[in-house]
């Protein structure tokens, strides 16, 4: 009964995007319906002075498409020297070609697989050798590269869990550790792209949730350690932007589902049945097609984290529905929040 009362009002909330933020000291602000946290991001002015951009160097991972692609172009337009890490640069990906077509000495695409220590170290050397004064370091690192998958625990192979973690979690750790010496010299910024699913769990998304919860914890630990050294660490937690990031298409969802079903142990297929399996896939298709196609709230959040004198600890670019749902999941007792999923 309570789950129904909660879910129906949530579904009627307008689809406007928010950017509710915790301040740098990590203190929670009251989350009231009348607070400024409910101002849509398109109308909200971040209350913080801006650092001069100059020609500060920033590295963004995962720039082949999605957030990273848009970020690279936007930060370049703001005057940054941008190193755009692209997984598919060596394969001539269309996104890489478009970035290269800008023909700017302030935007350089680099081959970068965040799972490869060798490629990461090569990029460290490329960045260091490109800086006017390496001793002054590099201003910003945006850990954006990520992959996603879906499937209930019994439907998901252990190998899939490892693959998602290698990119989303260990890729973030690997990149951060490799670039921290340059970031520390500049007293710069680390911005980690997490997700609302790094704050609240979701059925059929455990591989992704695990990694994003890990990114949240890693970011908090790093922020505590770096604060005395003048480095500021922020986390951006986007809502549902799947439709804007090309993570899934109807075809890719069906291909993943087909492979998943075929590889399931016979006992799992027998116990759950194809009807149950297909219903879960249909829910995933609906979720993927219902998200926002406008990435600007995320781009604005990352830009603020890189340029503000006092950047926020966390940014929440998401619509009202997901913002309120996250507050319920993270602030109310588990016995209540569980009712959203357990009926």
Curated annotation (Swiss-Prot):
Residues binding substrate: 195
GO molecular function: 3-hydroxybutyrate dehydrogenase activity
Entry-linked InterPro entries: NAD(P)-bd_dom_sf, Sc_DH/Rdtase_CS, SDR_fam
Compartments it resides in: Mitochondrion inner membrane; Mitochondrion matrix
Reaction(s) this enzyme catalyzes, per UniProt: (R)-3-hydroxybutanoate + NAD(+) = acetoacetate + NADH + H(+)
Modes of activity regulation: Requires phosphatidylcholine as an allosteric activator for enzymatic activity.
Domain of life: Eukaryota
GO biological process: steroid metabolic process
Xref: SUPFAM superfamilies: NAD(P)-binding Rossmann-fold domains (SSF51735)
Residues with the N6-acetyllysine modification: 73, 97, 132, 177, 212, 258-259, 280
Sites where a glycan is attached: 219
Annotated catalytic residues: 208 (proton acceptor)
Assembly with partners or alone: Homotetramer.
PANTHER family cross-referenced by the UniProt entry: D-BETA-HYDROXYBUTYRATE DEHYDROGENASE, MITOCHONDRIAL (PTHR43313:SF25), SHORT-CHAIN DEHYDROGENASE/REDUCTASE FAMILY 9C (PTHR43313)
Name of protein: D-beta-hydroxybutyrate dehydrogenase, mitochondrial
UniProt source species: Homo sapiens
